[in-house]
From Swiss-Prot:
Pfam families to which the protein is assigned, alphabetical: PsaA_PsaB
Binding residues for chlorophyll a': 677
Cofactor binding: number and manner: PSI electron transfer chain: 5 chlorophyll a, 1 chlorophyll a', 2 phylloquinones and 3 4Fe-4S clusters. PSI core antenna: 90 chlorophyll a, 22 carotenoids, 3 phospholipids and 1 galactolipid. P700 is a chlorophyll a/chlorophyll a' dimer, A0 is one or more chlorophyll a, A1 is one or both phylloquinones and FX is a shared 4Fe-4S iron-sulfur center.
Source lineage: Bacteria, Bacillati, Cyanobacteriota, Cyanophyceae, Nostocales
Membrane topology recorded in Swiss-Prot or TrEMBL: Multi-pass membrane protein
Name of the protein this chain belongs to: Photosystem I P700 chlorophyll a apoprotein A1
Listed GO CC annotations: photosystem I; plasma membrane-derived thylakoid membrane
E.C. designation(s): 1.97.1.12
Role according to the record: PsaA and PsaB bind P700, the primary electron donor of photosystem I (PSI), as well as the electron acceptors A0, A1 and FX. PSI is a plastocyanin/cytochrome c6-ferredoxin oxidoreductase, converting photonic excitation into a charge separation, which transfers an electron from the donor P700 chlorophyll pair to the spectroscopically characterized acceptors A0, A1, FX, FA and FB in turn. Oxidized P700 is reduced on the lumenal side of the thylakoid membrane by plastocyanin or cytochrome c6.
Transmembrane segments: 73-96, 159-182, 198-222, 294-312, 349-372, 388-414, 436-458, 533-551, 591-612, 666-688, 726-746
Length: 752
């Protein structure tokens, strides 16, 4: 940390705006394509509508003025936040108006969550299944009831108020988006002042946000949940404001409150140990993390981030400068190191977005795993349908975000990369030895593909020939995941040793006891064996192929031996012009397109693995003697060793419910299962046929229309190659995801 001389204090945190830079014009809004000179002329061919959608949010094509682009993105963020808060408000309103939340709250072990009742128009009311407690509706698997219980919400009136609050917030965000584009628009200098932005995001949003949440957890959630756990009737539990206003109510539950704020300033923090705990493990009543542990966690996070928010140099000449940190970051093998990255990040929002998407996508996948290993909300762990669905949901989201990160990194390379700024820095050096990177990665993919798949092929062959003693399995030739087992073991031994104050392990997935709630397993040690070793290497294979495709698109975005001037062709182009055969499907966009399919492969294997492994080795019932009966009876270790086992004992065996769902409350999933298969198959029509085929067909149809004097004024055109592939991949992913959704839901919901 340095104190800088006055001439270096170039980044004063000032509020710098332009007043009324862009008039609010409804006439402009009413003109489709007003942002593009060609589109504004109106449609001549049907391609116009596709280009309109492709370019509406591509602000780079509207203007080259970085300040205007920055303002548009900033305003769009407020619009996005408005949509999110509106959507959440709708969810919470459903909970208030159409749900059995209060019935569920009084008996979460036997009443299932439902927040939608179908109206009987053509017999759809068959979908309103009996969810217990005399309520009929569609069972939901979003985990919202469990979250609300964790928040401390005890009645539907509180949900109504929260829903209205969400609407108000959405209105404020919409106003803010309009205001900061049309009335008071920040100057480019404000957007590029990274130190001030870090201070605000770290200290205010993350730090104070976590601190506020810790306050809510301590003063409202923890006492409410403690009373609910003790079996106190909902109507006898004090309302949130009563806990806040009446200290006596809190002191009864947590005596540490009696000493007030004094122990904080006298550093006698042990006084607070009853509501800021470090227990580890799960609450045996609810199967969720201890709310007092969660409070402690958020308080610690708040302290860290509030300190972090004070580390960067703004108005007072002390603290770090991001540019200096980056430019001093040199190693013996990295040339100019991170020099130039500051300029990349502050002049290219694509570069900034790419890193954010990669981080956020990875974080989302980490969240997916924490949700079952350390279930944060009460009664989440024993709601198997919700557990399966939120895992699947977070995995898909994470996959899409990571591919988006690669997409925007590639757009940065094409549109924003400046070779003058990036001379012998890490980015330049990576690009210059891209051949070594890609060829090695390709070798890794081939190795993993042949070996991981080869193990399964061997096992299928041995089983087919009746030679089980020659298979790779826990009972024949063992391939134990010894490193994973070692990691599990050190985590199990941590309480009392490396984590001296923890009472239980961080997660029972590593080891320890079985936590059962109401006779159902919430979490227990997940034993790993040969079958896990095999599928782990399939994961490694699919992830590495996804990375290969996306990284190749990024590293060869500007040029390649095949097309040296690729940067001039843009992010998406079909081929390198006429007379250059073999140059199709090489654009940055095409790599993202291919990467999406491999992302789909990767995530599909992960969610299938999770679904079967949990049903086989974790989820199930516990009798009075402590014996566990798993849903699929522990068949993972022997069945998941062969491809045939995956097809027969997972896909086929567990599709029974969706295939036989007609005439039951789950019949919508049967229809969705078929419908989504059709959407998926429809995608193949776009992916397997060429543009010329369709253009010929269209011209024949136009001829017939001309004969009948009904030819349209807007000339029909076949989709371009890129448009066709975009429609294809969209339907492929939509169809595949919805098929999986119906398959998982019908199976897991039918198990109760």
């Amino acid at each position: 940390m340095t104190i800088s001389p006055p001439e270096r204090e170039e980044k004063k945190a000032r509020v710098i705006v332009d007043n009324d830079p862009v008039p609010t014009s409804f006439e402009l809004w009413a003109k489709p394509g007003h942002f593009d000179r060609t589109l504004a002329r109106g449609p001549k061919t049907t391609t116009w509508i596709w280009n309109l959608h492709a370019l509406a949010h591509d602000f780079d094509t509207h203007t080259s003025d970085l300040e205007d682009i920055s303002r548009k993105i900033f305003a769009a963020h407020f619009g996005h936040l408005a949509v999110v808060t509106l959507w959440l408000s709708g969810m919470i309103f459903h909970g208030a108006r159409f749900s059995n939340y209060e019935a569920w709250l009084s008996d979460p072990l036997h009443v299932k969550p439902s927040a939608q009742v179908v109206w009987p128009i053509v017999g759809q009311d068959i979908l309103n299944g009996d969810v217990g407690g005399g309520f009929h509706g569609i069972q939901i698997t979003s985990g919202l009831f469990q979250i609300w219980r964790g928040w401390g919400i005890t009645n539907s009136f509180q949900l109504y108020v929260t829903a209205i609050g969400g609407l108000v917030l959405a209105g404020l965000f919409l106003f803010a988006g309009w205001f900061h584009y049309h009335k008071r628009a920040p100057k480019l200098e404000w957007f590029q002042n990274v130190e001030s932005m870090l201070n605000h995001h770290l200290a205010v949003l993350l730090g104070c946000g976590s601190l506020g949440w810790a306050g809510h957890l301590i003063h409202v959630s923890a006492p409410t949940n403690k009373l609910l756990d003790a079996g106190v009737s909902v109507k006898d539990i004090p309302l949130p404001h009563e806990f806040i206003l009446n200290k006596g109510l809190l002191t009864e539950l947590y005596p540490g409150f009696a000493s007030g704020i004094t122990p904080f300033f006298t550093l006698n923090w042990g006084q607070y140990a009853d509501f800021l705990t470090f227990k580890g493990g799960l609450n045996p009543v609810t199967g969720g993390l201890w709310l007092t542990d969660i409070s402690h966690h958020h308080l610690a996070i708040a302290v860290l981030f509030i300190i972090a928010g004070h580390m960067y140099r703004t108005n007072w000449g002390i603290g770090h400068s991001i540019k200096e940190i980056l430019e001093n970051h040199k190693g013996p093998f990295t040339g100019e190191g991170h020099k130039g990255l500051y300029e990349n990040m502050t002049t290219s929002w694509h570069a900034q977005l790419a890193t954010n998407l990669a981080f956020l996508g990875s974080l989302t996948i980490i969240v997916a795993h924490h949700m079952y290993a350390m279930p944060p909300y009460p009664y989440l762990a024993t709601d198997y349908a919700t557990q399966l669905c939120i895992f699947t949901h977070h995995m898909w989201i994470g996959g899409f975000l990571i591919v988006g990160g690669a997409a925007h990194a590639t757009i940065f390379m094409v549109r924003d990369y400046d070779p003058v700024v990036n001379q012998n820095n890490v980015l330049d050096r990576v690009i210059r030895h891209r051949d070594a990177i890609i060829s090695h990665l390709n070798w890794v993919c081939i190795f993993l593909g042949f070996h991981s798949f080869g193990l399964y092929v061997h096992n299928d062959t041995m089983r087919a020939l009746g030679r089980p003693q020659d298979m790779f399995s826990d009972t024949a030739i063992q391939l134990q995941p010894v490193f994973a087992q070692w990691v599990q073991n050190i985590h199990t031994l941590a309480p009392g040793s490396t984590a001296p104050n923890a009472l239980e392990p961080a997660s029972y997935a590593f080891g320890g006891g079985i936590v059962a709630v109401g006779g159902k397993v919430a979490m227990m040690p997940i034993a790993l064996g040969t079958a896990d070793f095999l599928v782990h290497h399939i994961h490694a294979f699919t992830i590495h192929v996804t990375v290969l495709i996306l990284l190749k698109g990024f590293l060869f975005a500007r040029n390649s031996r095949l097309i040296p001037d690729k940067a001039n062709l843009g992010f998406r182009f079909p081929c390198d012009g006429p007379g250059r055969g073999g140059t199709c499907q090489v654009s940055g966009w095409d790599h993202v397109f291919l990467g999406l399919f491999w992302m789909y492969n990767s995530i599909s294997i992960v969610i299938f693995h999770f679904s079967w492994k949990m049903q086989s080795d974790v989820w199930g019932t516990v009798d009075a003697a402590g014996n566990v009966t798993h849903i699929t009876g522990g068949n993972w270790a022997q069945s998941a060793l062969t491809i045939n086992g995956w097809l027969r004992d997972f896909l086929w065996a567990q599709s029974v419910q969706v295939i036989n769902s007609y005439g039951s409350a789950l019949s919508a999933y049967g229809l969705m299962f078929l419908g989504a298969h059709f959407i998926w198959a429809f995608s193949l029509m776009f992916l397997f046929s060429g543009r010329g085929y369709w253009q010929e067909l269209i011209e024949s149809i136009v001829w017939a229309h001309n004969k009948l004097k009904v030819a349209p004024a807007i000339q029909p055109r076949a989709l371009s190659i890129i448009q066709g592939r975009a429609v294809g991949v969209a339907h492929y992913l939509l169809g595949g995801i919805a098929t999986t959704w119906a398959f998982f839901h019908a199976h897991i919901l039918s198990l109760g």
